[in-house]
Each structure stands twice: as C-alpha cells, then as structure tokens.
Amino acid sequence: MLAKRIIPCLDVKDGQVVKGVKFNELKLAGDPVELAQKYDREGADELVFLDITASIEDRGTMLEVVEKTAKNVFIPFTVGGGIKTVDDMRRLLQAGADKVSINSAAVKNPELISQGSDRFGSQCIVVAIDTKKTEEGYQVFINGGTKNTGIPLMDWVKEVKYRGAGEILLTSIDHDGGKNGYDNDIINQVARVSNIPVIASGGAGTIEDFYNVFHKGQASGALAASVFHFEEISVKELKNYLSEKGVEVRL
C-alpha cells in the first residue's frame, strides 16, 4: 500500500506566492522558497508550484524560483503553468523540478503528453484536469476553468492515460475554494477509470475532508492551498490525524 501524499500548492506570480499567505514567522510571507522550506520541514510529501504570471516574458523568474527551490528543498516538486512545448518542460526539469504539469496545452495538443512522456518518462508528466458538472455531465474546462471544451471528462481521462501521463491532478471547479470537502465521487471514478495516481484538488476545509478524499475518493494525494497558507491546518497535525484513522502516511 503506497503512502497517501499531502501536497501544498503555491500559486506564483512574478516570483511571489499569491492567494493569501499568512505566516507570522516568515520574513517574506510570499517568498516561494521560504514557504517551500517551511512545508518541507513540516513533513509535506510534495509541493506543486503553479506559475500564474500573465506575460510570457516573465517566465525566467519562475526558472530562478525552481533553481533555488531545488537547492533548498528535499521533497519532490511539480511545476505547472504556461508549459506549451517539450522545450518548456526540459527547461523546468533541468532547473530542478521533479515533474511538470500541463493543462490547457495538453487539451489543445494531446500529442504534447506523448512527447513529454517519451522524452522524460511518464513519472515526470502530470496532466492537470479542471472539471465541472454540466447538464451533459462532467466536462473538461480550460483557460483557468473559464472555457468549456465540451469534452466529456472520462473520455479525456482515458486519453491522458493512453498517452502516457504518470498522474492526474484533478480539480473540481465547483468545489474549489468552497472549503466544503473534495468532490469524492468524481475523484473515485477518475481513479478507477485511469488506474494511475490521482491527486485531488479543490475543496479542502477540514482535516476530515482529507480523510474522506483518501477513504471515499481513493485519491493518491490531496492538494490544498489556503488551509495550509493560513495555518488553519498544519501538515504535521493532519498526518498524525490520518495515521490515527488508519490511513497510510509518511510520518
């Protein structure tokens, strides 16, 4: 039985972490490397950095963040946002990222998944999928969750798996930011259909939500941002709770 993973998510814009960060003991609350080190010390299993910098010219800043993080942090981390080519992947992996995450670019050009997987190995390729329930059922959304592609979720999950993705990062747009728990039913279905690790994202509000996403959702990892950034839940406390409830975690 593989240990379940707890994964803080850091949204980085112009080299700073955004989306409310409240850390009293840090000199620079928005410094991604400091935050990454803090989560590493607390026992997080992995980290995800999402580069939400608007302009393409500023991508160099993210490479610096990746290089610094790789030197100072000893847990695996994934970088996503703005990756459109195999060359983009190569630059981030060479800078020290363990995995890259692709979302809209993969939907527009599914061959990118195959190319990345062939070149770097499937273990490096995470496909992020944003989904929302519509009248036609769950469908895939792109461009930050604003555009419905009309692609049925399960069709895309099967294609992503077939093309060599190593894992899926599944965000339920309806649950994101709501703090009412993860969308466990759809996470469970995606985990069963894909048969590759699924990281659940969107909806964490309490420590019970994490137990439920592992128990009911059968997720391999649980990603969250604000509950960690605002110190509503500490990684250490969360892992102790999960362990007491019989969930296999790395303590």
Curated annotation (Swiss-Prot):
NCBIfam families: hisF (TIGR00735). The active site is at D11, D130. This is Imidazole glycerol phosphate synthase subunit HisF. InterPro entries: Aldolase_TIM, His_biosynth, HisF, IGPS_HisA/HisF, RibuloseP-bd_barrel. IGPS catalyzes the conversion of PRFAR and glutamine to IGP, AICAR and glutamate. The HisF subunit catalyzes the cyclization activity that produces IGP and AICAR from PRFAR using the ammonia provided by the HisH subunit. Keywords: Amino-acid biosynthesis, Cytoplasm, Histidine biosynthesis, Lyase. It is found in: Cytoplasm. It comes from the Bacteria. Its EC number is 4.3.2.10. Its main location: cytoplasm. One of its GO terms (cellular component) is cytoplasm. GO terms for molecular function: imidazoleglycerol-phosphate synthase activity; lyase activity. It catalyses: 5-[(5-phospho-1-deoxy-D-ribulos-1-ylimino)methylamino]-1-(5-phospho-beta-D-ribosyl)imidazole-4-carboxamide + L-glutamine = D-erythro-1-(imidazol-4-yl)glycerol 3-phosphate + 5-amino-1-(5-phospho-beta-D-ribosyl)imidazole-4-carboxamide + L-glutamate + H(+). GO terms for biological process: L-histidine biosynthetic process. Belongs to the HisA/HisF family. Pfam families: His_biosynth. The keyword Cytoplasm applies. PANTHER family: IMIDAZOLE GLYCEROL PHOSPHATE SYNTHASE HISHF, IMIDAZOLE GLYCEROL PHOSPHATE SYNTHASE SUBUNIT HISF/H IGP SYNTHASE SUBUNIT HISF/H. Pathway: Amino-acid biosynthesis; L-histidine biosynthesis; L-histidine from 5-phospho-alpha-D-ribose 1-diphosphate: step 5/9. HAMAP family: HisF. The lineage of its organism: Bacteria, Bacillati, Bacillota, Clostridia, Natranaerobiales. Heterodimer of HisH and HisF.
